[in-house]
Amino acid sequence: MAHRRRCLLLLLAVLLPAMAARGDPDAVQDFCVPDAGRGRPVELAMLPAYPCRSPANLTAGDFAFSGVRAAGNFSPETGFAGVSVTPAQFPGLHTLGMSFARADLSAAGGVNPPHYHPRATETALVLAGRVYAGFVDSGGRLFAKVLEQGEVMVFPRAMVHFQLNVGDTPATVYGAFNSENPGIVRIPATVFGSGIREAVLERAFGLTPAELRRLEKRFGPPKKAEMED
């Protein structure tokens, strides 16, 4: 009995880290295009509730997407435009464990502000322009360089990263994620636009009340924290 118990504990010690390291669940079929109604908006979290459409009724069009041919809407403050594509926008991605995005940066200074994806690693391909890109690891070390057209950089999961157009022409970057729902946490908006008490931010960042009000105004009106005691 003791020997069996030791064997079981050893097996768990081997399997649990591997299970914890997994990303999205593995598919149990070739693909699953959800039967959610063509052209109808679908929440990403609700997709597993829909049955798969019959493979006999699928065409190549169900696995093609044209929504990233053009840039999204540019932010006048940052010169950034983003188009995110998950299975909610492109049902053909469902159960395939991936999503992607298009990022456009206006000439001479367009920036994708520091942010991170809590559930995915990202690979970013510079399709056009010159982009200064990088990430910061959990030890505070910066890994950054200027990427030329055709070059790729990887941003590890949950690491803060950014992109800045350092060229004289607009830049376009395509990002691919190893999760259907990578999530995104934008650092400036999260810190200064979420309603964190002013005393916390003033003390943490050494800001005066006037400086803090300016940042809160830029990144959105404070919202009452729903989970605050």
From Swiss-Prot:
It holds the Pfam family Cupin_1. Disulfide bonds join C32-C52. This is Germin-like protein 2-4. GO terms for molecular function: manganese ion binding. GO terms for cellular component: apoplast. Mn(2+) binds at H115, H117, E122, H161. Residues 1-23 form the signal peptide. The keyword Metal-binding applies. InterPro entries: Cupin_1 (IPR006045), Germin (IPR001929), RmlC-like_jellyroll (IPR014710), RmlC_Cupin_sf (IPR011051). Residues 66-213 form the Cupin type-1 domain. It is found in: Secreted, Extracellular space, Apoplast. Keywords: Apoplast, Disulfide bond, Glycoprotein, Manganese, Metal-binding, Secreted, Signal.
